[in-house]
Structures are given as C-alpha cells and as structure tokens.
C-alpha cells in the first residue's frame, strides 16, 4: 500500500541496529545530538550460541513490539493484519506471524532468509562460514539445535495466516530450498508459491502487485 491508500494503516519500521536505527543524529532531526548506531556488528554473529541474547531473538521481538504499538493506534484494525518483506524481511514476516499476540490475516515473504539451516549450510558458504567461525566449543549438532529457535522452517508451524511467497531459482544468498522448507511446513491450505526461474536474490517486478491483490482478496 501507499500513503494515500485509505484501506491500510501502514507501519514501516527497522529492527535494532539497522536502517532507521543506524544513522547520524543530523539525519534524524536538525538539532539531534545522539547518533543511532549499529552496536551489534555482524548481526548473524552477535551473541551466536546464546539463545536468550542472540541478535535475531531481539530482532524478532522488535517485530512483536511493532505490532503491539500498532494496537495502540486508533486507526489500526487488529483483526486484519498483513506483513510483507524480502530477504531478512521475509524471515521477519514469518517470525512476526508466528510470535505475535495478534493473529495475522496474510503474509508475503519473498526470497526469505533464515530457513532450514542444516541444508542451507550445505548449499552455500554464507552464513555458514560466519556460524562456524563463531560457534566456539559447540558441536555441529549443538549449533543446529541453537539455530532451530530462529529457523523459519520451525516458525512456520505456528502460523495460521494465508501466505504468498516467492523465490528465485538462481538465488545463491537465500536458495530456493531454504524458502520451500518453511512454506511446506505452513499448516494453512491457503498458500501459494511463485518460482522465478531466471531470478537471483531480488524482488520480482510484479511482486507488489501480486501481494496486494492477494491481501485484498482476504480482507474482511
């Protein structure tokens, strides 16, 4: 949706240390005195192996809190919630629908990150190399047990929303299998997956049109 679309109350936000939360004070307001900084370094590596302190635990909770904030707005209809995002945002779409206090109507994850880690790490080198460099004394079995808490394949089992998802078959950042795994675990029968044979890690030109049509068909 856009700012002039009266059917939606749209909330765009950034998780900790990223984008809006990683910029100079002067870029936030004219007399700003405090910079917003990424204090986490490599997000995937931050507190790796610490289940309660890992970066993506906090990032997922940022999404949950964003929904709680929306619930305080008079313009929000909390019976009709939608989420969409690509790459990391695709993973966050799965996470917020799985963990939110409020059920989502539909979500649209595209070329989603954080899916099916054991196979993910066998397919491509990143983020496998980062994980293995930061796993310390953990065995591979222990590492995958830790990562299972943040795996979209497992989060998907908690989602009741309708889902429209997509993947590029040439994607070497978030390969197709890592997108198909969570999609297959979704309990809903109201789900559709689009494959783009020539596409890499990118958003299809027609994607926004597709997801908005999907969302509008499911509005109450």
Where is each model-derived feature located?
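Hydrolase active-site cap/lid region
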Residues: 92-139, 203-206
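Active-site nucleophile elbow and catalytic-triad environment of alpha/beta-hydrolase enzymes
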Residues: 140-155
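Short alpha-helix in the alpha/beta-hydrolase fold that links the catalytic acid
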Residues: 161, 175-184
